[in-house]
Amino acid sequence: MAFLIHSPLEQFEVTSLISLNLPVLGYINLSLTNLGLYTILTVYLVLALHIMGSNNKQLIPSRWSIALESSFASVHGLVKSQIGAANEMYLPFIYSLFFFILIANLSGNVPYGFTVATSIMVSIGLSMTIFIGVTILGLRLHKVHFFSFFVPSGTPLGLVPLLVPIELISYLARAFSLGVRLFANVTAGHVLMKILAGFLAPLFTSTFIISVLTVLPFIIFTGIIGLEIAVSFIQAYVFCVLTCSYLKDAIDLH
């Protein structure tokens, strides 16, 4: 029995779906890739789910409306505990960020789908944008005093030249660590599912006895799919927790 195993990394390849060449400003090539398509679909799904869950004209809320309100309450509690009640102006941003990452991760679990977070450019782009925004916020609030963040309180004067570069490197690493964490966790799960599915599919099309014996590994595989769905929620939540932590550092210089 021959096994045809494709690379588990093929699912992360960014391919052009529609390409358009325009003779504007010399030569312009416009193309819609699978990454761009699923990013647009993610934004559309986030908006559509909230519009459908709107409960403005109903006295009794629907189950979907209750689920959205519960999600909002959870994110609100996160922002309140991490940043403080006085800084709830950042709640819309954190809430939008949570649902964008969540829907992007969940849509990638659909067969033949594409996970936006498995693009290192998107993940690093998100973390870089947050890092730059948080840094600008800290400079706007504290001016020159913002640089005291790189000198831990109570540090002896003799250790300042040693600790400042360490703190600076640690701070700059945030621009990448946030995105790399999301990228690595989501990518690892999809690679594992691709490898297991590549082995199980030929076994099911084999002899009757082998097909029956494959039921148990398939049940385990189904459990891994459920675990990957849970990871979609966890990674969205962890990303928002760390973003709130960075916002708190910029606001309070802790």
Swiss-Prot record:
Where found in the cell?
A: Mitochondrion inner membrane
Q: InterPro entries this protein is in?
A: ATP_synth_F0_asu, ATP_synth_F0_asu_AS, ATP_synth_F0_asu_bact/mt, F0_ATP_A_sf
Q: What stretches pass through the bilayer?
A: 32-52, 83-103, 119-139, 146-166, 182-202, 207-227, 228-248
Q: CDD domains from the entry? A: ATP-synt_Fo_a_6 (cd00310)
| BP GO terms, sorted | proton motive force-driven ATP synthesis
* Topology of the protein relative to the lipid bilayer: Multi-pass membrane protein
- MF term (GO), any: proton transmembrane transporter activity
Q: Does the keyword GTP-binding apply?
A: no
Give the pro-peptide residues.
1-6
Q: Can you quote a single GO CC term?
A: proton-transporting ATP synthase complex
Keyword line:
ATP synthesis, CF(0), Hydrogen ion transport, Ion transport, Membrane, Mitochondrion, Mitochondrion inner membrane, Transmembrane, Transmembrane helix, Transport
The Swiss-Prot or TrEMBL record describes its family as follows: Belongs to the ATPase A chain family.
Oligomer and partners: F-type ATPases have 2 components, CF(1) - the catalytic core - and CF(0) - the membrane proton channel. CF(1) has five subunits: alpha(3), beta(3), gamma(1), delta(1), epsilon(1). CF(0) has three main subunits: a, b and c.
Q: What does this protein do?
A: Mitochondrial membrane ATP synthase (F(1)F(0) ATP synthase or Complex V) produces ATP from ADP in the presence of a proton gradient across the membrane which is generated by electron transport complexes of the respiratory chain. F-type ATPases consist of two structural domains, F(1) - containing the extramembraneous catalytic core and F(0) - containing the membrane proton channel, linked together by a central stalk and a peripheral stalk. During catalysis, ATP synthesis in the catalytic domain of F(1) is coupled via a rotary mechanism of the central stalk subunits to proton translocation.
Name-wise, this protein is ATP synthase subunit a
Q: Which organism is it from?
A: Mycosarcoma maydis
Name of the coding gene: ATP6
